[in-house]
Amino acid sequence: MTTKRKPYVRPMTSTWWKKLPFYRFYMLREGTAVPAVWFSIELIFGLFALKNGPEAWAGFVDFLQNPVIMIINLITLAAALLHTKTWFELAPKAANIIVKDEKMGPEPIIKSLWAVTVVATIVILFVALYW
């Protein structure tokens, strides 16, 4: 059966997400994918520079020392930290851990994830700088 009646479609502006702080933060969090793509491309270029010898690597290091690139990389770091924070806050909601017939709160899980992140960062920096 077909109908000639046109269904009602509620109008939606392109700025619908700007009305509530929750949606603005959601769009900001999803926007952290763009700096992640930048870092991935930069890392791939660094690997190719490393493969192509000392001259290519020196050129890549010079590229990284450009003030504009340093600012972009700081923005990328901030975006990665924001993304990490939101994922760590989401993790306890996905894992129901029960201790002595009570559900564990989110704080120990979040603190554990940050502790693992800090330890892994220190180990990687130690190996990279002193090994």
Curated annotation (Swiss-Prot):
Keyword Ligase among UniProt keywords: no
Keyword terms of this UniProt record: Cell inner membrane, Cell membrane, Membrane, Transmembrane, Transmembrane helix
MF terms (GO), sorted A to Z: succinate dehydrogenase activity
Gene3D superfamilies named in the record: Fumarate reductase/succinate dehydrogenase, transmembrane subunit
GO cellular component: fumarate reductase complex; plasma membrane
TM ranges: 30-50, 63-83, 109-129
Subcellular location: Cell inner membrane
Membrane-protein topology: Multi-pass membrane protein
InterPro entries attached to this UniProt entry: Fumarate_red_C, SQR/QFR_C/D
Transferase keyword on record: no
Subunit structure comment from the entry: Part of an enzyme complex containing four subunits: a flavoprotein (FrdA), an iron-sulfur protein (FrdB), and two hydrophobic anchor proteins (FrdC and FrdD).
Family that this chain belongs to: Belongs to the FrdC family.
Its biological purpose: Two distinct, membrane-bound, FAD-containing enzymes are responsible for the catalysis of fumarate and succinate interconversion; fumarate reductase is used in anaerobic growth, and succinate dehydrogenase is used in aerobic growth. Anchors the catalytic components of the fumarate reductase complex to the cell inner membrane, binds quinones.
HAMAP family: Fumarate_red_C
Record-given protein name: Fumarate reductase subunit C
Organism whose genome encodes this protein: Escherichia coli O81 (strain ED1a)
